[in-house]
């Protein structure tokens, strides 16, 4: 159960299940679907580790890509994700529910079919909301609290044993080259690719280095 509660599907199902129950109890209730916070939770499960809000008051957002963190203007790419990827997620869920409903027996499974219809109706309303400016603004506001990292600025580029290159991160402590990860908290980069030193490929460079070191530290 603990693992399930950390999945996107778990939170998405909650947004359409709790509200569909309300609709069944009160058919005249023109619900808009789940609350802004509930939908923001789905977004957080989708993108935790890829986005961070470093300043809730001023709306400062960062995105992890290409092995390091980049600051993004007002979280524009996250807002676009609400309009595109998150809507697609709900649309796929609608298709899944409709296909399941078709497979049920119209008579013996009538209650189950009605329950699915209620979920589909709620999901459709959420899909509509995810394309509305005001709704997206409210979801972004709720997302600030969820994605907020109060120690983000303190951790940025604070590890002296890590060096970010265009194609990965050199970890001097572990003596390895690896993909960057969000927990590295790197923003600065050499902007050049790292290549392992090989005698065949870097023969002349190795010779120059040895020559330089011998002159710098001559053997007596």
PLM region spans:
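Replication-associated primase and helicase/ATPase modules
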Residues: 1-48, 93-125, 201-202, 211, ...
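Extended, Lys/Arg-enriched charged tracts that mediate electrostatic binding to polyanionic substrates
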Residues: 25-42, 120-169
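Generic detection of long, well-ordered alpha-helical segments
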Residues: 29, 33-34, 75-83, 113, ...
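Noncatalytic partner-interaction/assembly domains of nucleic-acid and motor enzyme complexes
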Residues: 32-99
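A broad, structural surface signal
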Residues: 41, 80, 84-91, 141, ...
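A structural signal for alpha-helix termini and helix-coil/disorder junctions
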Residues: 46-49, 88, 92, 145, ...
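P-loop NTPase catalytic core of nucleic-acid-dependent motor ATPases
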Residues: 50-77, 155-158, 162-163, 169-220
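Intrinsically disordered, low-complexity coil segments
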Residues: 54-57, 74-80, 96-122, 141-151, ...
């Amino acid at each position: 159960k603990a693992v399930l509660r950390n999945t996107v599907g778990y939170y998405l199902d909650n947004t359409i299940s709790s509200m569909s129950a309300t609709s069944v109890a009160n058919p005249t209730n023109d619900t808009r679907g789940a609350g802004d916070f509930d939908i923001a939770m789905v977004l957080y499960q989708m993108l935790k580790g890829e986005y961070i809000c470093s300043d809730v008051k001023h709306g400062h957002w960062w995105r992890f890509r290409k092995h390091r963190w980049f600051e993004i203007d007002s979280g524009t790419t996250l807002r676009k994700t609400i309009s595109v990827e998150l809507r697609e997620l709900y649309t796929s869920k609608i298709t899944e529910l409709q296909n399941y409903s078709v497979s049920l027996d119209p008579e013996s499974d009538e209650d189950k079919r009605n329950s699915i219809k209620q979920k589909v109706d709620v999901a459709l309303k959420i899909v509509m909301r995810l394309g509305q400016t005001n709704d997206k603004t409210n979801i972004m506001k709720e997302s600030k609290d969820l994605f907020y990292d109060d120690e983000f600025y303190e951790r940025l580029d604070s590890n002296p044993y890590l060096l970010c290159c265009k194609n990965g991160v050199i970890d001097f402590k572990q003596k390895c080259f690896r993909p960057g990860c969000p927990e590295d908290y790197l923003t600065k980069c050499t902007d050049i690719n790292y290549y392992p030193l090989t005698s065949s490929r870097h023969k002349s460079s190795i010779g120059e280095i040895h020559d330089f070191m011998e002159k710098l530290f001559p053997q007596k």
